[in-house]
């Protein structure tokens, strides 16, 4: 008699296990890699992505592209996550890390199909990654921090390598210098949020400028603003979160008055409350008043009469950066405005940049800060420029903290590939095949660089293998001559951290996907499955 089957999972649950689902997961990761494959390197193409709301984004950055893709496959999401983590940790190498993870999986796919146990693959990969990381640390070149000129040269080269694959690669020398200047202005903590990037449409890219201090766009202002001075030396700055404006009652207030005098007394009281606040600000000695909330026309004219400058509705992040740079603290009341809570800077001025007016605070005593003002044409182009600069800034920060570099352009990957191939020949058994597969997967980076530039990849890789076998460990792809070259001599440098991070993240992701032996998808509940488009605010579900 047949035993009764035990039904454990809900009806409609999709469960797949064994080798077929593992192969399916590997194939899904290949599809993700295909999406960013062509963006790698200085001859990489850009992607134009339009989201559900019709907003267009042009980008070459692997992490940005993967964020904008609406990936639903659970295994493929892992690759999106490692690209995001690489972006957050080191800023560059996001496309490389996705390609490496997908290529590791591609190389082990035949072994998986033949039934090799996933744990053997994982063990081999962990060994290979450890060997590769140790090799990078061993051959990386360290630049002495004491020699400031040399260190600066190193940082500029690293920034130029990061920018060479971006839309602004034509101006990479100009922006590399700007990025290094910006990071050098910061204090030892190198806080990323102390570098502000503001975009002003119009003008050429070369008109972009670096301001040693805080700069933000002039806020909306009321009549009387034009009377205020636009430049101060050594002013005191009041940072407020206070509304300086006469407004209608927020709540449904009800006041019963019997005579005109009663009504007048209420009106006078409202004015007196406002004037009382303004007087306290004036007596505090502040010359520049910034508030997160609106500053109305009465207050604007009051300050103008007393040679004071004010700006209301200042964005919170700009107010916080001003506070961190100039000192002082943001006050929610004007009753305790003493010199301790006021900020200071050497010069405050308002200047015209393109069609916009900007407020500048320079010579800030508390924290070193700076602002990059970008100029350019189309909005999408400027957004991509901002993303490119973010990557370059992250790379320069990493290079300052870890001052060892390796050659880019596929050189370090070819050297690691040769090293692991030689190592694999010294060990017996299945590990030999798997470490050999890992070594072959590393060649995807130089191969893809060649493919994206339209070169004959097989020919160039053969030349590279031969040169690395003869001991030319820094030889990589030379995009300009369609040949190979010593990329260390050509100053194609990257911080060693970028490569170490990319290898470990890609290897871990590959191991994670190989170790999954069953995928169970719960059915979507019937309520969720119904079209939710009609539900907005106040239109709940029908019960």
Curated annotation (Swiss-Prot):
CDD domains documented for this protein: TCP1_eta (cd03340)
Region Disordered, annotated ranges: 524-543
Modified residues (N6-acetyllysine): 67, 250, 320
EC number: 3.6.1.-
Substrates-to-products reaction catalysed: ATP + H2O = ADP + phosphate + H(+)
Listed GO biological process terms: binding of sperm to zona pellucida; chaperone mediated protein folding independent of cofactor; positive regulation of telomere maintenance via telomerase; protein folding; protein stabilization
Classification via Gene3D superfamilies: GroEL, GroEL-like equatorial domain, TCP-1-like chaperonin intermediate domain
Keyword terms of this UniProt record: Acetylation, ATP-binding, Chaperone, Cytoplasm, Hydrolase, Isopeptide bond, Magnesium, Metal-binding, Methylation, Nucleotide-binding, Ubl conjugation
Top EC class for this record: hydrolase
N-acetylmethionine modifications at: 1
Name listed for the protein in its UniProt record: T-complex protein 1 subunit eta
Biological source species: Bos taurus (Bovine)
């Amino acid at each position: 008699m047949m035993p009764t089957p035990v039904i454990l999972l809900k009806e409609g649950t999709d469960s797949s296990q064994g080798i077929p689902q593992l192969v399916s997961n590997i194939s899904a990761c290949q599809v993700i890699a295909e999406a960013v494959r062509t963006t790698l390197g200085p001859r990489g193409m850009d992607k134009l992505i339009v989201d559900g709301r019709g907003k267009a984004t042009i980008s070459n950055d692997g992490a940005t592209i993967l964020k904008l893709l609406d990936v639903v496959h659970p295994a493929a999401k892992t690759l999106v996550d490692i690209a995001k983590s690489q972006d957050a940790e080191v800023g560059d190498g996001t496309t490389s890390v996705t390609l490496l993870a997908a290529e590791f999986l591609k190389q082990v796919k035949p072994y998986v199909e033949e039934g090799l146990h996933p744990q053997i693959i994982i063990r081999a990969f962990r060994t290979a990654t450890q060997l590769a990381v140790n090799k990078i640390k061993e051959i990386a070149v360290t630049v002495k921090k004491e020699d400031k000129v040399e260190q600066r040269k190193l940082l500029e080269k690293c920034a130029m390598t990061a920018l060479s694959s971006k839309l602004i690669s034509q101006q990479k020398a100009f922006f590399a210098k700007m990025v290094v200047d910006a990071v050098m202005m910061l204090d030892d903590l190198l806080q990323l949020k102390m570098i502000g990037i503001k975009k002003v449409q119009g003008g050429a890219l070369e008109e972009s400028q670096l301001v040693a201090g805080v700069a933000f766009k002039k806020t909306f202002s009321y009549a009387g603003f034009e009377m205020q001075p636009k430049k101060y030396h050594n002013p005191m700055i009041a940072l407020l979160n206070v509304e300086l404006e006469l407004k209608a009652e927020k709540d449904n207030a009800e006041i019963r008055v019997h005579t005109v005098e009663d009504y007048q007394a209420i009106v006078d009281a409202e004015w007196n409350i406002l004037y009382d606040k303004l007087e306290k600000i004036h007596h505090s000695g502040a010359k520049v008043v910034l508030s997160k909330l609106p500053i109305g026309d009465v207050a604007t004219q009051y300050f103008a009469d007393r040679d004071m400058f004010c700006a209301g509705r200042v964005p919170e992040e700009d107010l916080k950066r001003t506070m961190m740079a100039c000192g002082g603290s943001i006050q929610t009341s004007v009753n305790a405005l003493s010199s301790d809570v006021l900020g200071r800077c050497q010069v405050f001025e308002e200047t015209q940049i393109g069609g916009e007016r900007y407020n500048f605070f320079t010579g800030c005593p508390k924290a070193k800060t700076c602002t990059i003002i970008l100029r350019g044409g189309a909005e999408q182009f400027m957004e991509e420029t901002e993303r490119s600069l973010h990557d370059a800034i992250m790379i320069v920060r990493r290079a300052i903290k870890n001052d060892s570099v390796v050659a880019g352009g596929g050189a370090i990957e070819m050297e690691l590939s040769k090293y692991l191939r030689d190592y694999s020949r010294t060990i017996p058994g299945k590990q030999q095949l798997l470490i050999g597969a890992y070594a072959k997967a590393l060649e995807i980076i130089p191969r893809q660089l060649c493919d994206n530039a339209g070169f004959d990849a097989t020919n160039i890789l053969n030349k590279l293998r031969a040169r690395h076998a003869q001991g030319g460990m820094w030889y990589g792809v030379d995009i300009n001559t369609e040949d190979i070259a010593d990329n260390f001599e050509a100053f194609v440098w990257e911080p060693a951290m970028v490569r170490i991070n990319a290898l470990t993240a890609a290897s871990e992701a590959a191991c994670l996907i190989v170790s999954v032996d069953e995928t169970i998808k719960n059915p979507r509940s019937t309520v969720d499955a119904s079209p939710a488009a009609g539900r907005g605010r106040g239109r709940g579900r029908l019960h």
